[in-house]
């Protein structure tokens, strides 16, 4: 249990506690407030240049001609393309608008549990799609503990919101790497094309 895996899991509890204390659904007609929380998996997509994030680190390594360093190769994460949770958030917002009391709850948006990859698989696929690059796996010594498996239960979002991820993890990686292979002047139109295609 790492801080990264514990703190996000507390958000649904907090999202339930505050409304129950201050905006209880039984008194919705009085206060007219409905609060929901939404949690996403590990989001990937073009335009993320943050440090210590898997895809930007892969791209920087490839573009600099350096080996990509894979620190936790067997760690499994719920990777998903950025438009997946955004679609879920918009759907949740619409449902909250239509039936605020019913949908004021905690929701998860991520891939199906049978569609997860470990870090090494993501790196290998990204390098393959990019068409060049290499990776190395240094010995794991003195690194902070990180959970080996993180996943989200999206069952409620699937059954009650009728939300489904549209892309498999492999497709999310492909959409993402295709974006990074472009030059800056192409980003805008390509992004619009990805949104329309999605």
Set out the residue ranges of the language-model regions.
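Conserved C-terminal active-site "lid" loop/helix of NAD(P)H-dependent oxidoreductases
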Residues: 82, 105-106, 142-164, 175, ...
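Glycine-rich loop motifs involved in handling phospho/adenylate chemistry
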Residues: 74-77, 142-146, 193-194
